[in-house]
């Protein structure tokens, strides 16, 4: 089992460690609901060092990487980033990722950074290398046993401003830059991104700097948060979890990610023909939000029923600490995906009433 450079700090700081995607990671510290509310109301921090980080360098790297993603990479420029997906030949989703444009590194070459999911990191890296290196790009794992730390919540950016002495009001959502943070030896790659539905930043640091910053943040009263709160936060924000809400058999239209597909651009990409056909016919199934009556929680793969008959499955479900009711994402036939449709979810042999509602369940006012 792999361990991040923050493992000991998490364990000795009260983290309950569990296996996740081949890593020992903290599932919670003080308690899921307390951690969840810290992020919604103030600020929390997460060790996300299990995720993969690749750097691609070469001539025209966006043109070359464009072969692998359906989103027009020329919509972002240096200092900007985009969320997108990797596809297979059938238009199914191999993984989701964020691509950061670092701009030119010399007269002839540019660079991109890719952050990929932990569970897919090895297969993604091999697959990307196999396609990008023959096309002239170098692909380097730059995490190098370093730290990825997510600082999330309405007080995250003010706290970073305090630690760096910089005004970050001009850093837009999905913008990124290097920051000098007091007490750290190296500059810190800082992106205004996250997986919680709150403002915040994700930071890439050396192992030593990551440990120092984690300790600094603890001293400032920042709540350490585990995978449990990360999941409830992202689910309230209706953010997808790869392997549950989408997979290699789900295309972006079926996953509610059709906005990532830019078929109007001339560039070819893996899965383009399949997505052109899918766009023409429309999806047979859709990912929807559900609110359930009562307090029973719908979990992954629980059957969704219509008039007592199975019609789909729950992809993710939880108790929402913010809304104080059960919520879920579910894959159901397009014909039943209209807002307000009454369905039910089979939970421990009982049909629990549920209603199709607008996503996300929570949005920062």
UniProtKB/Swiss-Prot annotation:
Family: Belongs to the GcvT family.
Example GO biological process: glycine decarboxylation via glycine cleavage system
Gene3D superfamilies: Aminomethyltransferase beta-barrel domains, Aminomethyltransferase fragment, Probable tRNA modification gtpase trme, domain 1
Record note on quaternary structure: The glycine cleavage system is composed of four proteins: P, T, L and H.
Highest classification ranks of the organism: Bacteria, Bacillati, Cyanobacteriota, Cyanophyceae, Synechococcales
Substrates-to-products reaction catalysed: N(6)-[(R)-S(8)-aminomethyldihydrolipoyl]-L-lysyl-[protein] + (6S)-5,6,7,8-tetrahydrofolate = N(6)-[(R)-dihydrolipoyl]-L-lysyl-[protein] + (6R)-5,10-methylene-5,6,7,8-tetrahydrofolate + NH4(+)
N-terminal signal peptide: none
Name of the protein this chain belongs to: Aminomethyltransferase
Function: The glycine cleavage system catalyzes the degradation of glycine.
Keywords recorded for this protein, A-Z: Aminotransferase, Transferase
InterPro entries to which the protein is assigned, alphabetical: GCS_T (IPR006223), GCS_T_bac (IPR022903), GCST_C (IPR013977), GCV_T_N (IPR006222), GcvT/YgfZ/DmdA (IPR028896), GcvT/YgfZ_C (IPR029043), TrmE/GcvT_dom1 (IPR027266)
Pfam family, one: GCV_T_C
GO-annotated molecular function: aminomethyltransferase activity; transaminase activity
Protein EC: 2.1.2.10
Keyword 4Fe-4S: no
Keyword Transferase tagged: yes
SUPFAM superfamilies, per database record: Aminomethyltransferase beta-barrel domain (SSF101790), Folate-binding domain (SSF103025)
Gene Ontology cellular component annotations, sorted alphabetically: cytosol; glycine cleavage complex
């Amino acid at each position: 089992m792999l361990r991040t450079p923050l493992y000991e700090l998490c364990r000795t700081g009260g983290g309950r460690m569990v296996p996740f995607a081949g890593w020992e990671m903290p599932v919670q510290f003080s308690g899921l609901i307390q951690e969840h509310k810290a992020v919604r109301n103030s600020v929390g921090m997460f060790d996300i060092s299990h995720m993969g980080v690749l750097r691609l360098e070469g001539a025209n790297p966006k043109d070359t990487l464009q072969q692998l993603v359906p989103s027009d990479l020329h919509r972002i420029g240096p200092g900007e980033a985009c969320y997108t997906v990797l596809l297979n030949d059938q238009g199914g989703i191999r993984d989701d990722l964020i691509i950061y444009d670092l701009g030119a590194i010399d007269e002839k070459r540019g660079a991109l950074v890719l952050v990929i999911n932990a569970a897919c990191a090895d297969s993604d890296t091999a697959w990307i290398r196999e396609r990008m290196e023959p096309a002239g790009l170098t692909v380097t794992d730059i995490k190098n046993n370093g730290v990825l730390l997510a600082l999330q919540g309405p007080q995250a950016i003010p706290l970073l401003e305090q630690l760096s002495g910089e005004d970050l009001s001009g850093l837009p959502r999905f913008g990124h830059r290097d920051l000098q943070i007091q007490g750290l030896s190296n500059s810190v790659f800082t992106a205004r991104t996250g997986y919680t539905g709150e403002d915040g930043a994700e930071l890439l640091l050396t192992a030593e700097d990551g440990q120092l910053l984690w300790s600094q943040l603890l001293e400032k009263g920042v709540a350490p948060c585990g995978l449990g709160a990360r999941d409830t936060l992202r689910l309230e924000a209706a953010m997808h979890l790869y392997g549950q809400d989408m997979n290699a058999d789900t295309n972006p239209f079926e996953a509610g990610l059709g906005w990532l597909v830019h078929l109007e651009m001339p560039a070819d990409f893996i899965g383009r023909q399949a997505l052109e056909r899918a766009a023409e016919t429309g999806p047979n199934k859709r990912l929807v939000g559900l609110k359930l009556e009562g307090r029973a929680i719908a979990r992954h793969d629980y059957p969704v029923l219509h008039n007592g008959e199975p019609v789909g499955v729950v992809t993710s479900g939880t108790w929402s600490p913010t809304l104080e009711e059960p919520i879920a994402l579910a894959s159901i036939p397009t014909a039943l995906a209209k807002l307000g449709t009454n369905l039910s979810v089979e939970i421990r042999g009982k049909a629990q009433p549920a209603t199709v509602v607008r996503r996300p369940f929570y949005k920062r006012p």
